């Protein structure tokens, strides 16, 4: 029974729960790695050893957080749980493939951990650029294991993407039109398209790297007519859409949370929100070389990538102001989920503004590979993606479990986390402007103050993570059941109660629209 339910599961809710648990566990590992990084940088001098081990930790931190925490929770967890419920489908289109998508991740994670354990580890950064990732600078199996790990995670995501696209296009009941599809469903659909188009390019790039390392090909080796810059183009053609993949489902969740706790029946500018997400998805594919302003591109090429990158700020701004407009005139309920959503809007916007700064190719020459970039992408990921996950988690926790979290603890948790992440990452802007480079385990004494403050912030965030574990335990132990849910007419996922039965929408739903 246990094996049939959890190992051979074909139920979207159970698979979503597995993704959630796996993502939470990986998040603990990633948090531990980030604490190691900040402990090393907390004061000048060496803590862990040389830069190789430091860069192994940094690389593992990036891969764990991206491929094993944010993506499994947002797309695998929330996506699996909510998409079928929101569109009134009985399950995903391919339930067994759904299960395989999940079970490819633990072996992938195992390979990544193995890569750190053998030889000297993969100290390449998450970009895995040759020649540093080649078989001279990184002899041994570490980078090869990392490549195989990425292959498995990539296959998992591609299969998941096919599943979501098929489900969303084909499994809506006739009563739901395209324009009644909830924004979270739209966001997952667009995310799935991005995954489907970008991951094969990454697979090609890392496969060529694998053959360069092991079969003496010279795709990225000038000695045989190859070019390491080709790898950078292939990687970033995946890598830039990837960062939008990480944030788009968050946009969808924030839209639902802001609408719900503003007491509105729909978000402001529904069509504009859909257009904005589609625009971001499209533009995300044509800006990749802004990660490569320092490799010596022509001035006209740099001008194009600068302006194209700045254009993305327009649909993003549409979303931010639509969220604010959704709240306007509403009866706002200051629930923990709403606090996360407001924190998201504020901090994501700050991250977006530093992104606009970095999009200027001339400025980026100076800021590239400094802590300014680290601060920028942690504002959009550590305070964008993670805040969206937290907001979604506390909002839908009653749906997933049938129990309610303690509101007071949840608000305290938000406050600690908010202080922690800002104290960690805001000073890094100053470090970057002062020229402190990334990916070094030590630094000149002049940078000590901001690094010490940053490291203190990371320990505050750690406290918040531990408190969240306590909060979940408290909720599951107290067993406060959900009494009633408001606004179910526009929030279809709640209509079956909390938690919903194992099978939902076994016959096609008819959704009566009031307008």
From Swiss-Prot:
The top EC class, named as a word, is translocase
E.C. number, please? 7.1.1.9
Q: Which residues are involved in binding Cu cation?
A: 240, 290-291
Which positions are linked by 1'-histidyl-3'-tyrosine (His-Tyr)?
240-244
For binding heme a3, which residues are annotated in this chain's numbering? 376
Sites where the protein binds Na(+): 40, 45, 441
Record's keyword terms, sorted: Calcium, Copper, Electron transport, Heme, Iron, Magnesium, Membrane, Metal-binding, Mitochondrion, Mitochondrion inner membrane, Respiratory chain, Sodium, Translocase, Transmembrane, Transmembrane helix, Transport
Which pathway, per its entry?
A: Energy metabolism; oxidative phosphorylation
Spell out the Pfam families in the cross-references. COX1 (PF00115)
Name the needed cofactors. Answer: heme; Cu cation
Which residues hold O2? 244
Per the record, what are the reactions this protein catalyses? 4 Fe(II)-[cytochrome c] + O2 + 8 H(+)(in) = 4 Fe(III)-[cytochrome c] + 2 H2O + 4 H(+)(out)
GO CC, one annotated term? respiratory chain complex IV
Localization terms from the record: Mitochondrion inner membrane
Please give the biological process terms from Gene Ontology that the record holds.
electron transport coupled proton transport; mitochondrial electron transport, cytochrome c to oxygen
CDD domains xref list: Cyt_c_Oxidase_I
Instruction: Give the Mitochondrial intermembrane membrane side ranges.
Output: 41-50, 118-140, 213-227, 287-298, 358-370, 434-446
- Topologically, how does it sit relative to the membrane? Multi-pass membrane protein
Annotated function: Component of the cytochrome c oxidase, the last enzyme in the mitochondrial electron transport chain which drives oxidative phosphorylation. The respiratory chain contains 3 multisubunit complexes succinate dehydrogenase (complex II, CII), ubiquinol-cytochrome c oxidoreductase (cytochrome b-c1 complex, complex III, CIII) and cytochrome c oxidase (complex IV, CIV), that cooperate to transfer electrons derived from NADH and succinate to molecular oxygen, creating an electrochemical gradient over the inner membrane that drives transmembrane transport and the ATP synthase.
Protein name per Swiss-Prot or TrEMBL? Cytochrome c oxidase subunit 1
Which species? Answer: Heterogeomys cherriei (Cherrie's pocket gopher)
Lineage, opening ranks: Eukaryota, Metazoa, Chordata, Craniata, Vertebrata
- By which gene is this protein encoded? MT-CO1
